[in-house]
Regions:
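Long, compositionally biased intrinsically disordered regions
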Residues: 138, 174-303
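Exposed, interaction-prone assembly regions rather than primary DNA-binding/catalytic cores
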Residues: 84-164, 168-172
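Short helix-capping/hinge SLiMs at alpha-helix to coil transitions
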Residues: 16-20
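Short acidic, hydrophobic short linear motifs in intrinsically disordered regions
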Residues: 21-32
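Short, amphipathic alpha-helical interaction segments positioned at domain boundaries
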Residues: 64-97
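Short alpha-helical segments that sit at the start of domains
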Residues: 1-13, 81-84
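Accessory beta->alpha helical hairpin/"wing" motif in late/C-terminal subdomains of nucleic-acid enzymes
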Residues: 43, 52-73
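Short amphipathic alpha-helical interaction segments
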Residues: 32-47, 52-53
C-alpha cells in the first residue's frame, strides 16, 4: 500500500481540512475532477489514518496532522465545542464550494490575520470573500437563526470599521427588513443562499456594464460623480445597475428620489432581481437585461 496521499487532489483535500477543521463527506466532490472513484479515495485516506470520519463529517486523523505539520500547511486545531459546530460546518461548505474558483477565494473568520481571537468568537461574520481582488466581509443568516441573532448581525455590521463591502447570505430573504441593512457602507449585498447565487457570486465583478450602457444609451451616458447612481447624462437620466440586491445603493436612490420629486431613476437588472428591488423602488424605470450575455465565465466541470 502507498502510505502517502495520491496526487494533488488528495493533498489539496487534506490541506483544506487542516485549515477549515471539518468537511462534510458530501462536499468532497469539490476536490476531485472525476466523481467516479472519489468515495473510494476518501475511504483509502481514512484507512491510511490521514482522515477520520465522524458520522457524515471528515476531520484530520493522526497521520494527517503529522503530514500537515511536516509540510508546514496552515493548521487550525479542531474546535470540539458543539455550540459552534453548525457554524463551522457552514463555513467549510462555503469554502469547499469556492475551493476551485479562479475568481473567488474564501477566508474563514478564524483564519483572518487582521482579527483578534476575541473578535472571532464575539463577532458574527463568518469570513471574507475575495472576488476579483475586492474583499467582502461575509455573514450568514440561516432558517434556524432567531430574530435576536439577526439583530446581532445588524449591530455587528454597524460597528465594523475596516470593511466597507458586505455580503449577507440568507436562507430566506423574507426574514429581514431590507431597510435595516443600510449603514452608510459602500455595498451591502443581501443574497439568498442558493447554489445558483453562489455560482453568480463568482462573476460579481466580471460584468461588462459599460457595454450594457452603450447598448441602451448610445454613448449618451457617462460614469457618474454622484453616489446615488452609476451612470448619468447629467440631465435627466440617473442610471444604477444591480447584479444582486444592494441595500446601500437602494437607500441612496431612495434618498435622491425623496429629495428630487420631479426626477426618476433608471435601474438595470435581471427580471429576478427586479422583483425584489421593485418592493423598495416601485416608481423606478426598469431595464431588464440577461447579464449572462455580458460575462466571461471560468470553466470548471465536475463529471
Amino acid at each position: 500500500m502507498n502510505y502517502f496521499p495520491n496526487g494533488d487532489e488528495e493533498i489539496s483535500l487534506i490541506k483544506f481540512i487542516a485549515k477549515f477543521q471539518y468537511l462534510s463527506v458530501n462536499d468532497t466532490k469539490y476536490f476531485f475532477s472525476t466523481q467516479k472513484y472519489y468515495r473510494k479515495r476518501i475511504t483509502s485516506l481514512v484507512q491510511k489514518k490521514y482522515l477520520r470520519r465522524t458520522k457524515s463529517t471528515l476531520v484530520l486523523d493522526e497521520l494527517g496532522i503529522e503530514y500537515c505539520k511536516l509540510f508546514n500547511f496552515e493548521y487550525t486545531p479542531l474546535n470540539r465545542n458543539q455550540k459552534y459546530f453548525p457554524r463551522l460546518l457552514y463555513i467549510s461548505n462555503l469554502g469547499a464550494y469556492f475551493h476551485n474558483s479562479k475568481t473567488t477565494q474564501f477566508t474563514p473568520s478564524f483564519a483572518m490575520k487582521d482579527k483578534e481571537m476575541f473578535t472571532i468568537t464575539a463577532r458574527k461574520f463568518i469570513g471574507v470573500l475575495d472576488i476579483n481582488g475586492i474583499e467582502y466581509l461575509t455573514y450568514h443568516i440561516s432558517s434556524e437563526h432567531t430574530n435576536k441573532y439577526i439583530l446581532s448581525v445588524i449591530y455587528d455590521i454597524q460597528k465594523e470599521r475596516k470593511y466597507k463591502n458586505i455580503i449577507v447570505l440568507i436562507d430566506d430573504l423574507n426574514r429581514i427588513n431590507k431597510q435595516d441593512f443600510a449603514f452608510g457602507n459602500n455595498q451591502v449585498l443581501v443574497i439568498e443562499d442558493s447554489e445558483e447565487n453562489r455560482e453568480k457570486l463568482k462573476y460579481l465583478n466580471s460584468v461588462n456594464w459599460s457595454r450594457i450602457i452603450e447598448k441602451h444609451y448610445r454613448n449618451k451616458a457617462y460614469i457618474a460623480e454622484y453616489n446615488f447612481c452609476d451612470y448619468t447624462d447629467y440631465k435627466s437620466k440617473y442610471i444604477s445597475y444591480f447584479y444582486f440586491l444592494d441595500t446601500e445603493k437602494i437607500n441612496r436612490i431612495k434618498y435622491f428620489l425623496r429629495e428630487n420629486k420631479n426626477k426618476n431613476a433608471d435601474i438595470i437588472c435581471t427580471l429576478k432581481i427586479k422583483k425584489e428591488i421593485q418592493k423598495e423602488l416601485p416608481t423606478a424605470h426598469y431595464i431588464i437585461v440577461d447579464l449572462e450575455d455580458y460575462i466571461d465565465k471560468e470553466r470548471i466541470v465536475y463529471d
